C-alpha cells in the first residue's frame, strides 16, 4: 500500500514508520509512506503557510497555494487511482467498517490540516473524502492520519504475524473483543478461566464469543442494535445475561 501525507510536520510520522507493526510493514516493503510539506512549496523568505480568513475572526487558515501545490505533487507521484482524504472534524467518523473500506485502496493521499482548517474551495476541488476520528478538537490532522494509517495497515496481507489477528480485533465483527489472559495462571488470587486451559478448542471458541457478546452488551449496547445476531449468538448472549444478573444478585 502506498500512502502520501501532506503535513507541515512530517517528522511526527516517525512514530508510525519507525516503530511497531507499521514500522515492520515499512521495513518489509508492505507499506510505503511518503511526505510533502506545504512549506516546501512557498516562495517567500519566511516560508509562510498560513493566511487570514475572509470575514475576520480568530485564527488563521492554511495558505491555499502551498497546500494545493503539495497536493498536486503528491498526486503526480501517486499516479492513477489515489484517493485524496482530508482529516477533518466534519468528516465521516472512522469505525472498523470504514477502516475495512479504506483498506481496499492501494493508494491514498492524506491531507493534514492545521490552524483553523483549509479553504472550502480546496476541499471541493482537491479532496475526495473527509474522515474524522471523533467529536473532539485536535491541533492538527497528523494524529488522526496516523490513526488511520495504523488501523488500515493491519489489513495489508503479511503485516500481522497472523492474519486472523485483524479479523479477531475488537469491532472486526461489530463486537468488542473478549478478555485475554497469559501467565501466570493465578494473579493476586484471580485465576485464568478453566476453559482456556482445557485444550477444547470448540469450548474455547464458544466462551470467547459469549464473552465478546457480553462485554459489548455491558459496555457498548448500541453496537448490538445494528447487528443481526445468529441463533448461536442470541443464545450465548442470553446465557451471559443470566450469569451476569445472577452474580449481581449475590452481591
From Swiss-Prot:
Record Pfam families: tRNA_m1G_MT (PF01746)
EC number: 2.1.1.228
Keyword line: Cytoplasm, Methyltransferase, S-adenosyl-L-methionine, Transferase, tRNA processing
Residues where S-adenosyl-L-methionine binds: 113, 133-138
Enzyme class: transferase
Annotated compartments: Cytoplasm
GO molecular function term, any single one: tRNA (guanine(37)-N1)-methyltransferase activity
Function noted in UniProt: Specifically methylates guanosine-37 in various tRNAs.
Quaternary structure, from the entry: Homodimer.
UniProt protein name: tRNA (guanine-N(1)-)-methyltransferase
Amino acid at each position: 500500500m502506498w500512502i502520501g501525507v501532506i503535513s507541515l510536520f512530517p517528522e511526527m510520522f516517525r512514530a508510525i514508520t519507525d516503530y511497531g507493526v507499521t514500522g515492520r510493514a515499512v521495513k518489509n516493503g508492505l507499506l510505503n509512506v511518503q511526505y510533502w510539506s506545504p512549506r516546501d512549496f512557498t516562495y517567500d523568505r519566511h516560508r509562510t503557510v498560513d493566511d487570514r480568513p475572509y470575514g475576520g475572526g480568530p485564527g488563521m487558515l492554511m495558505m491555499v497555494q502551498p497546500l494545493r501545490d503539495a497536493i498536486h505533487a503528491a498526486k503526480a507521484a501517486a499516479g492513477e487511482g489515489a484517493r485524496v482524504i482530508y482529516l477533518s472534524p466534519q468528516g465521516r467518523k472512522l469505525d472498523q467498517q470504514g477502516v475495512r473500506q479504506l483498506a481496499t485502496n492501494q493508494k491514498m493521499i492524506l491531507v493534514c490540516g492545521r490552524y483553523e482548517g483549509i479553504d472550502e474551495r480546496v476541499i471541493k476541488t482537491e479532496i475526495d473524502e473527509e474522515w474524522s476520528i471523533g467529536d473532539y478538537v485536535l491541533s492538527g490532522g497528523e494524529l488522526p492520519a496516523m490513526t488511520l494509517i495504523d488501523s488500515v495497515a493491519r489489513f495489508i496481507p503479511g503485516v500481522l504475524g497472523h492474519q486472523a489477528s485483524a479479523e479477531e480485533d475488537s469491532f472486526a465483527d461489530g463486537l468488542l473483543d473478549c478478555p485475554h489472559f497469559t501467565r501466570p495462571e493465578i494473579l493476586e488470587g484471580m485465576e485464568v478461566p478453566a476453559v482456556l486451559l482445557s485444550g477444547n478448542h470448540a469450548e474455547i471458541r464458544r466462551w470467547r464469543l459469549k464473552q465478546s457478546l457480553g462485554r459489548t452488551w455491558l459496555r457498548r449496547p448500541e453496537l448490538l442494535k445494528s447487528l443481526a445476531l445468529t441463533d448461536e449468538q442470541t443464545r450465548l448472549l442470553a446465557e451471559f445475561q443470566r450469569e451476569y444478573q445472577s452474580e449481581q444478585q449475590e452481591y
